[in-house]
A protein has these predicted regions:
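Gly/Pro/Ser/Thr-rich low-complexity, intrinsically disordered segments predominantly at protein N-termini
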Residues: 1-178
Length: 178
């Protein structure tokens, strides 16, 4: 067998496109070595896997937030992969309208962000990382990005025009941090 070395890519020379990230993610999903990996997998712009297993309280807040968002109708999803211009990320919780789901519901990963993307902050998160994810979700079509801080029991809301005083989505977050 002769290998055409012109076609062999040994190094990644530039950040991957959304489409290339999507292919990389689907390949990982189909790889038996990753079938039972606990926690979510994200892929940075260079195609590297990033794994961030959550703690118990993080999971509780995530589940409560999913229940709250379910009151809006539509679909609530957890750790759903989204291919963005800045990497493939899996927000802790997302909410999508029926219209969004009819257009994008069968994609794996999603090639656009649902209307609401929420990140539940973990001690390992950095301000820079959260800012980048917020920008990535908004650039991919999210209407709002919620940053949920379990330790300080607060939420930040971001829209396409910047920080929001409150969310445009009428949900009761009072029981989120009990």
């Amino acid at each position: 067998m002769i290998i055409d070395m012109e076609k062999v890519q040994e190094l990644i020379e530039a950040p991957l496109s959304r489409e290339e990230l999507a292919v990389r993610y689907r390949d990982l999903c189909e790889d038996p070595l990753f079938a039972n990996v606990p926690g979510k997998i994200e892929i940075d712009p260079w195609g590297r896997m990033v794994m961030s297993p959550p703690g118990v309280y993080h999971g509780l807040v995530q589940a409560r937030l999913a229940r709250v968002l379910a009151s809006l109708g539509g679909e609530t999803m957890v750790e759903t992969p989204i291919a963005t211009p800045m990497g493939l990320f899996a927000p802790d919780v997302t909410w999508a309208s029926g219209q969004f789901m009819s257009t994008h519901g069968r994609e794996n990963p999603l090639m656009a962000a649902p209307e609401v993307c929420a990140e539940v902050v973990s001690p390992s998160n950095s301000v820079k990382e959260l800012k980048e994810k917020t920008e990535a979700y908004l650039a991919s079509g999210a209407h709002e990005v919620w940053i949920v801080y379990p330790q300080s029991k607060r939420c930040e809301f971001h829209g396409t025009q910047g920080p929001l005083e409150r969310s445009a989505y009428a949900v009761d977050l009072a029981g989120l941090f009990r």
